[in-house]
Amino acid sequence: RRGAGGPGGRGRGRQGRRHTDRKDALKRFEKQGFPSKKDESWKYTSLKSIIQKNYNLSSKSDKSVELRDVKKYFLNDLDSFKIVFVDGIYSPFLSKTTHDGMDICVLSAALSKEKYKSTLKKYFNQIVPKDESLASLNTSYTKEGAYIYIPKGVCPEDPVQIMHISTGNQESIWLQPRNLIIADKNSKVEIIERHQSLKDHSVVTNSLTEIYAEKNAFVDYYKIQNDLNSATLIDNTFISQQRDSNVSVHTFSFGGKLTRNNLNFYQKGENIQSTLKGITILESNQHVDHNTLVNHEQ
């Protein structure tokens, strides 16, 4: 009989905790439901027309995209790491990841490996509020996303591009990407995340990103939201900052039928810099709602 401390026991332990997290999150969402205009922080945005439809929660299409189809959406004039998802599924062909002195890969790989156990226990799902129903929905159903860990004192020259591509090969799809980004002490990282639909089709992306900036860490995060006008994006970002850290989030909202940005900073020390910048350019039938929170815990 293999004990709980053996390799199989450790694997089952990780999967067991993840299963429990999913079940608990789903129970919270079922109790809370979707937010509505009755909620103070959602009084300007209604999801009623969106949630009345039926959606597929996973991609059934085996069709991928060619580099020529998406090349123009990358920042190609600079060297960079790339983590690319097509209809919520990781595309290794379009990606460039690394484990050389840092970890830039997919979250599912990190969750499945023993060497990331202590890091994930410390950070994963630790600053996501229990009363955010759409965050709970993401925790319950997410399958994939980006995992970025920059160790102490490491400052990579190349930025990281995270690309979420919706092809339109499958009508009415609901995507739940999840990103975990950790900048350890005295490290620095630049990240560009883009949401891009290729066809006019009904797609809802309920994205969640956790960012942890340890002491004296620097994070520059650029969000490019340029879906076509039939897409909905709900972007939930939770940022934990330790003393002397500096995190800047630059949000560019250009496309999509409905975009909702929930940006939350949690300052856990002194001499912290939290920068929020953005540009929103809309047409008459588009709706963008930015909701921000800066919580000074000390």
Where in the sequence are the language-model features?
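Conserved beta-strand/loop scaffold segments within soluble protein domains that form the structured core
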Residues: 93, 97-98, 103, 107-298
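Charged, compositionally biased N-terminal leader segments and the immediate start
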Residues: 1-11
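N-terminal amphipathic, basic helical "cap/leader" segment at the start of enzyme domains
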Residues: 9, 14-136
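Charged, low-complexity, helix-prone segments enriched in Lys/Glu/Asp/Gln
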Residues: 1-3, 21-26, 260
